[in-house]
Amino acid sequence: MATLKAVCVMKGDAPVEGVIHFQQQGSGPVKVTGKITGLSDGDHGFHVHEFGDNTNGCTSAGAHFNPEGKQHGGPKDADRHVGDLGNVTAKGGVAEVEIEDSVISLTGPHCIIGRTMVVHAKSDDLGRGGDNESKLTGNAGPRLACGVIGIAKC
């Protein structure tokens, strides 16, 4: 069973930056690990966006990666975008990322390689905010930092 790896170097408005690693064994869940620094303390939305285009900063990455046309939700919800990874929590300006997700993949139709990882300014309400924006973005606010997810050496 082959192990696949990917990496994302996130940059944005100073001082927010980070490096995120992705690892998947066979068709198992993807382990997402890493660190993002320069954040305000608290929860920040953390999503895979549709395009690997950062020509106009993080805005050109498009919407959340959502090949099945579902509503925004939390990472444990059946009704969610593929790219909905919930929140990362910063303490002392640093978010230690440790997520395991069975919806994203490093191969096939849910493949995130070549797409953009984004950390947002505000907490993701996981689609439970009671308004239209909640069902699209989780009201996570502006994009603080982003980077294209690329294949890494195994």
Curated annotation (Swiss-Prot):
GO biological process, one term: removal of superoxide radicals
S-glutathionyl cysteine modification, residue list: C154
Keyword Nucleus: yes
SUPFAM superfamilies: Cu,Zn superoxide dismutase-like (SSF49329)
Lipidation (S-palmitoyl cysteine): C8
Enzyme class per UniProt: oxidoreductase
The entry's keywords: Acetylation, Antioxidant, Copper, Cytoplasm, Disulfide bond, Glutathionylation, Lipoprotein, Metal-binding, Nucleus, Oxidoreductase, Palmitate, Zinc
Binding-site residues for Zn(2+), renumbered to this chain: H64, H72, H81, D84
GO cellular component: cytosol; mitochondrion; nucleus; peroxisome
Cofactor binding mode and count: Binds 1 copper ion per subunit.
Chief location category: cytoplasm
Pfam family, one: Sod_Cu
Intrachain disulfide bonds: C58-C146
Protein family: Belongs to the Cu-Zn superoxide dismutase family.
Subunit structure: Homodimer.
Protein name: Superoxide dismutase [Cu-Zn]
Organism: Gallus gallus
Lineage: Eukaryota, Metazoa, Chordata, Craniata, Vertebrata
